[in-house]
């Protein structure tokens, strides 16, 4: 039977519940347990697919095509379980399910209420995502005290009663601020946060206390006394140099042993050698490279969270310190690509909408003409095609119909038909809703022999995750290829261009998919690893000049 660990957060948001949950999951996995993680988000959106990255951060895409919270990216980077659409539910999705049932008459004319109908649906979704695992860790988004979180908190309160204390426990993550002027840590916010939680019927079994510095035994004893939590179960989680140290920090305080004991789990001792290896490798840096990230959401790093982590992973596996320099594409549009002179490599990530596109095109032109290593992802590949069509093929004004429906040379257009991850045919047009209607999830891609892409991956066929509506217009492929563009990757049915590269460039690759979603610190991703190695070579060549 599945055991449940419910994780809540208090005092302030952005404490790192997702990292803490994923780290504990990694330790439990290292003890031989099958672990999954579920994120419950209180917002009314059905999913984050149409939300602004400035508000939500990146949208993480699962292999089965779900658009989910970025915390699922943390989950996949820390544990080996592949996340699915069952690992993320929002208030909007829960209410949508309940309203559909009400319209069908499933409630037999009854009055539909938050309790029991919404809470029952929340419990059903949790159990659906947890099925067949030894342990399910369920993270409740938001902060205790927020009105939006109340149905979720009520649902997990009920689950604890229904399952019993040996099948469900509560972990509360809270802030213990350090006041520099007095040199003291303050426990009062934590006390009040737990008081708020207890007022709705939830008594935490474990407290994880986020702080700048390790908590003293006296502070831990004080927190334990005022929150009714065992002293050994008050865990100090101070700021770490790397998030990949956190499994070791939690294990050193016996958090996994506390959890195993409370849930009566049979598990071997944790083998964290894999995580120790990652941390040791991260400490070895023989060179620093500067990689330009040219995007439109550069004010918020979380908008490119998985790419940032993928570059970090590549650095770990190449003994490289990767310094990401963020460039607002509109600044390059205004001031030119000479801003990129000191850069060792250029990356243009995905995005939507016309703003900043011309700046991205200028950055790509600079990379092509100056032989700077380049990696384009999703929109990054599309803008690379536009740049090549305009400046090499000579199709002046070439564009995507996403940005200019009247362009004379629509080198990119809306995909009207494709096969979904499960093999079903999807059909779209300009009037289709924006939400949940893109080409999403893992898709097969065939790599052409003798190409850089084939060399990087080392195999003829790959599966990568997609999130897009527009694709290269096959009408212009022959002309592009004739002028030196190499189509190095195509969809399984050969109808869609998935990867491009240049014949006369040392390292120029672009892909329609999102390789960042499958990178992890243990193995890195070949595309990012080779990109960082190319940046190292370019850096060394610059030094010789």
From Swiss-Prot:
<feature type="binding site">
    <location>
        <position position="402"/>
    </location>
    <ligand>
        <name>L-glutamine</name>
    </ligand>
</feature>
<feature type="binding site">
    <location>
        <begin position="14"/>
        <end position="19"/>
    </location>
    <ligand>
        <name>ATP</name>
    </ligand>
</feature>
<comment type="subunit">
    <text>Homotetramer.</text>
</comment>
<feature type="binding site">
    <location>
        <position position="139"/>
    </location>
    <ligand>
        <name>Mg(2+)</name>
    </ligand>
</feature>
<keyword id="KW-0547">Nucleotide-binding</keyword>
<dbReference type="InterPro" id="IPR027417">
    <property type="entry name" value="P-loop_NTPase"/>
</dbReference>
<keyword id="KW-0479">Metal-binding</keyword>
<dbReference type="GO" id="GO:0005829">
    <property type="term" value="C:cytosol"/>
</dbReference>
<dbReference type="InterPro" id="IPR004468">
    <property type="entry name" value="CTP_synthase"/>
</dbReference>
<keyword id="KW-0315">Glutamine amidotransferase</keyword>
<comment type="similarity">
    <text>Belongs to the CTP synthase family.</text>
</comment>
<keyword id="KW-0460">Magnesium</keyword>
<dbReference type="GO" id="GO:0046872">
    <property type="term" value="F:metal ion binding"/>
</dbReference>
<dbReference type="InterPro" id="IPR017926">
    <property type="entry name" value="GATASE"/>
</dbReference>
<feature type="binding site">
    <location>
        <position position="351"/>
    </location>
    <ligand>
        <name>L-glutamine</name>
    </ligand>
</feature>
<keyword id="KW-0665">Pyrimidine biosynthesis</keyword>
<dbReference type="Pfam" id="PF06418">
    <property type="entry name" value="CTP_synth_N"/>
</dbReference>
<feature type="binding site">
    <location>
        <begin position="146"/>
        <end position="148"/>
    </location>
    <ligand>
        <name>CTP</name>
    </ligand>
</feature>
<feature type="region of interest" description="Amidoligase domain">
    <location>
        <begin position="1"/>
        <end position="265"/>
    </location>
</feature>
<feature type="binding site">
    <location>
        <begin position="186"/>
        <end position="191"/>
    </location>
    <ligand>
        <name>CTP</name>
    </ligand>
</feature>
<keyword id="KW-0067">ATP-binding</keyword>
<feature type="binding site">
    <location>
        <position position="71"/>
    </location>
    <ligand>
        <name>Mg(2+)</name>
    </ligand>
</feature>
<dbReference type="GO" id="GO:0003883">
    <property type="term" value="F:CTP synthase activity"/>
</dbReference>
<dbReference type="GO" id="GO:0044210">
    <property type="term" value="P:'de novo' CTP biosynthetic process"/>
</dbReference>
<dbReference type="GO" id="GO:0005524">
    <property type="term" value="F:ATP binding"/>
</dbReference>
<feature type="binding site">
    <location>
        <position position="71"/>
    </location>
    <ligand>
        <name>ATP</name>
    </ligand>
</feature>
<dbReference type="InterPro" id="IPR017456">
    <property type="entry name" value="CTP_synthase_N"/>
</dbReference>
<feature type="binding site">
    <location>
        <position position="469"/>
    </location>
    <ligand>
        <name>L-glutamine</name>
    </ligand>
</feature>
<feature type="active site">
    <location>
        <position position="516"/>
    </location>
</feature>
<feature type="binding site">
    <location>
        <position position="13"/>
    </location>
    <ligand>
        <name>CTP</name>
    </ligand>
</feature>
<keyword id="KW-0436">Ligase</keyword>
<feature type="binding site">
    <location>
        <position position="13"/>
    </location>
    <ligand>
        <name>UTP</name>
    </ligand>
</feature>
<dbReference type="GO" id="GO:0042802">
    <property type="term" value="F:identical protein binding"/>
</dbReference>
<comment type="pathway">
    <text>Pyrimidine metabolism; CTP biosynthesis via de novo pathway; CTP from UDP: step 2/2.</text>
</comment>
<comment type="function">
    <text>Catalyzes the ATP-dependent amination of UTP to CTP with either L-glutamine or ammonia as the source of nitrogen. Regulates intracellular CTP levels through interactions with the four ribonucleotide triphosphates.</text>
</comment>
<feature type="active site">
    <location>
        <position position="514"/>
    </location>
</feature>
<dbReference type="GO" id="GO:0019856">
    <property type="term" value="P:pyrimidine nucleobase biosynthetic process"/>
</dbReference>
<dbReference type="InterPro" id="IPR033828">
    <property type="entry name" value="GATase1_CTP_Synthase"/>
</dbReference>
<feature type="active site" description="Nucleophile; for glutamine hydrolysis">
    <location>
        <position position="378"/>
    </location>
</feature>
<feature type="binding site">
    <location>
        <position position="222"/>
    </location>
    <ligand>
        <name>UTP</name>
    </ligand>
</feature>
<feature type="binding site">
    <location>
        <position position="222"/>
    </location>
    <ligand>
        <name>CTP</name>
    </ligand>
</feature>
<dbReference type="GO" id="GO:0004359">
    <property type="term" value="F:glutaminase activity"/>
</dbReference>
